[in-house]
C-alpha cells in the first residue's frame, strides 16, 4: 500500500542532453554550409568568409532579444550571402556587370604580377584590397563576392547600433531592419564586387563615432573616429571631402565638450596637424579624380566599352540629366541637387530600372521628411545627435550631387548615406505618431451612448435599493 501511495517522479533529461541536442542541431545547420569547402577546395576561403558574415548577424546580442527580431536579422544576413552565391556560380545580377568585372580583372592581374596601382586611393584602393585577398587565399570569384557580403552584414550590425544611438536607446524593430536591409539598389550593389558595401559601412561607423564623441568626448573614441574617417574617405574623393568636414565637426565637439585645459590644448594641437595634410590630400585627390582615366580605359575590354554604350543608349537607369533646364551657372548647384535627389521624374521613367529608382527616391524623400521631424520633436542630446547625423547626410549628398550627372550613378551614390537616413527617418515617424494628438470623431458613438445610458440606469436603480433606502414598489 505504501508503495502505491508513493508519488510518481517525473523524469527529466539532464542538462547535458539538452546541450547535446543543441550541438546536434547546430551541426545539422552548419554541415551543409561546410560541405562546399570540401567539394570546392579552391573557394574554401570564400565559404569560410560567408560563414563569418552570417555569424556576425546571428551572434549579435541585440538581435537575439526576441524571436521576430532574430529571424528578421537572420533572413537579412542570408540575403547578401545568397546573392553572392548567385553572382559567383549562376549568373551576374544587375549592378555587378561592368564595374565588378573590371575590379575582378584588375585585382587578378595585380595579385599575379605584384604591380600595385598608384596612388592607393579610390578604385585603386579597392583593387589593392581585392588583390591582397587573392595573394593570401588564392584567386577566387566567390572570395571577392563573399568579402562584399561580409561588409554588408557588418553594415547591418552598425546600423542597429546607429539606430539605437539616434533613438535614445530604443530597440530596433523588425520593420526598421527590413526597410534598411531590403532596399533593391543597396542589395544588388552590396552583393557585387563593388566599393558600395565598404563605403556604406565606414560612413555609418564614422557617423556613429561622431555621435559618441558628442555624448562623451574621449581621446580613444576620437582616434577610432580618425581611423573610421580614413577608411571612409579612401574609397572615393567625395567621401574623403565628407570625412574632412566630419573631422572638423569632431574637433569642434572636442574643444567645446571638455572642461580640461590640457585636453583642449591637446585637441587644438592635434587638429591642425591632422586636418592640414588631410585637407591637402582630399582636395588634391578630388581634383585629380576625373573619369575616364587611361587606367580605366585599359581595364575595360572592347566588349565592356560596347556594353557601356548600349546601356547609355537604352537607358537602363543611367539616363543623363546634365542638360536639364537650369543646369548652367550658379543655378547648377541647387538644381543639380534636386535632380540628383529626385531624378528620374515620373515622366522620365522608361523602363523597370527607372521605376525602381523613382520609388527609391520617393522612399528617401519620405525618410528625409521623417529626419527633419525627428529634429523638430526631439530634445536635448537626442536633438544634437539628429543634427549631427543630418549634417553628415546633407554634406555627403551635396558633394555627390556636384559630380553626378545621371540617375543610375546617383542610385549608387545614395547607398553610403542610406543607413543614417533610414535610422533618422524611421525614428522621426515614430516620434510623430507618438506626439500626434488623438482626433475625436465628430459623430457620436451610438453604441457607447447606449452602454453609458444602461450603466447609468443600473447604478440609479442600485442606489434606490441600497440598504437604508425604501423600495417604493
What residue spans do the PLM features occupy?
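Transmembrane alpha-helix segments characteristic
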Residues: 24-30, 77, 224, 381-402
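Membrane-interface alpha helices of multi-pass inner-membrane proteins
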Residues: 32-36, 187-188, 209-213, 221-243
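Transmembrane-helix motifs of polytopic, lipid-linked glycan transferases
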Residues: 57-61, 146-167, 366-370
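Extracytoplasmic catalytic/substrate-binding loops of multi-pass membrane glycan-assembly enzymes
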Residues: 90-106, 116-129, 138-139, 330-334, ...
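Transmembrane-helix signature of polytopic, membrane-embedded enzymes
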Residues: 159-182
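Membrane-interface helix-loop-helix junctions at transmembrane boundaries of multi-pass membrane enzymes
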Residues: 165-166, 171, 212, 216-220, ...
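Short acidic/glycine- and proline-prone juxtamembrane loop motifs at membrane-interface regions
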Residues: 191-197
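Alpha-helical transmembrane segments and terminal signal-anchor/GPI-anchor hydrophobic tails
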Residues: 237, 241-360, 459
